[in-house]
Amino acid sequence: AVPEGNPKGIESFDQLAELLKSGDVLLAIGNSDVPVGQYTQKIFAYYGLDESAMTDCLTYGNNVKEVTTQVSEAAVDCGIIYATDAFSAGLKVVDSATAEMCGQVIYPAAVLKGEKEEAAQAFLDYLQTADAMSVFESVGFSPAN
């Protein structure tokens, strides 16, 4: 995602990788101990980028919200965040990572045994309907397979 106006004109991960190699960009990413940071490290590996060689190009957040804030405040040229966080913050998503780049982000759901098992199953069933999928898509999620 990029800040309002996209000052660096970043339009793709390919372009971002080239800017990182040249040292001509400031990118916000999550720390390596949080999921968004772990996905980012996979993207770096996909592009053959060495994080330790890019220290002047990177800022870190303790979580995806901190990375999103850095982008929203235009403290950085771009940030690697989830599309849903970009949507919530009103940021422009210029490219999306593919499953080949970093694997697929999956949010599992299950029904546990307990006194509200029927209600939980009904809710899980609803989450798999076309109506629910359209709500998910409207806020940046991809449909479940």
Name what the model sees in each region.
Residues 2-145:
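Exported/periplasmic ABC-transporter solute-binding proteins
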